[in-house]
């Protein structure tokens, strides 16, 4: 495996925790763990996470792997992605979202992305921080997609001023096969 961690500024504790990746068998000369630091102090377009991803396009492009599991540091959980990856491949989805069904009485955190599905399991709507949501399915800010699609999303968004990865997915719910 190859794990690229996009490290925000002031991340000394994270870097110290990850070290060389030995604890996760990622301390190798080829592939392994890569800490990807910001290349500039100012965002390229001023908004969204696409800027940060665009700074590390070469890492993605040069990777020998065909798929990406994209996640965030805002969610802490223990997850084995193997079954999600197999599901992604078996459904021939463009993007597979990792989500959890929220209990009726549980409050959502600010910025939550709520996802609606049709009867076949395909995403029909994504709501970003809605005051009231028609769905109880909260996207965990984790997804599986091809490396090519991720590169395409980043380059498309950058050619239009940057933006946020989730908003790119939201804008393309009808064009992409998202489950």
What are these regions (language model features)?
Residues 1-179:
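Unchanged
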């Amino acid at each position: 495996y190859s794990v690229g961690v996009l490290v925000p500024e002031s991340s000394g504790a994270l870097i110290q925790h990850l070290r060389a990746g030995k604890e996760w068998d990622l301390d190798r000369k080829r592939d392994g763990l890569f800490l990807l630091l910001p290349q500039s102090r100012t965002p390229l377009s001023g908004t969204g996470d696409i800027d940060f991803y665009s700074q590390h396009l070469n890492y993605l492009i040069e990777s020998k792997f065909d798929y990406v599991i994209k996640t965030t540091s805002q969610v802490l959980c223990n997850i084995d992605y193997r079954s999600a990856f197999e599901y992604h491949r078996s459904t021939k989805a463009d993007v597979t979202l990792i989500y959890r069904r929220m209990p009726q009485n549980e409050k959502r955190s600010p910025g939550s992305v709520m996802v609606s599905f049709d009867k076949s399991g395909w995403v029909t709507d994504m709501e970003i921080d809605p005051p009231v949501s028609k769905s109880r399915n909260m996207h965990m800010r984790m997804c599986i997609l091809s490396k090519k699609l991720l590169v395409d999303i980043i380059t498309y968004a950058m050619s239009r001023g940057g933006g946020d990865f989730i908003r790119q997915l939201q804008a393309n719910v009808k064009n992409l096969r998202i489950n």
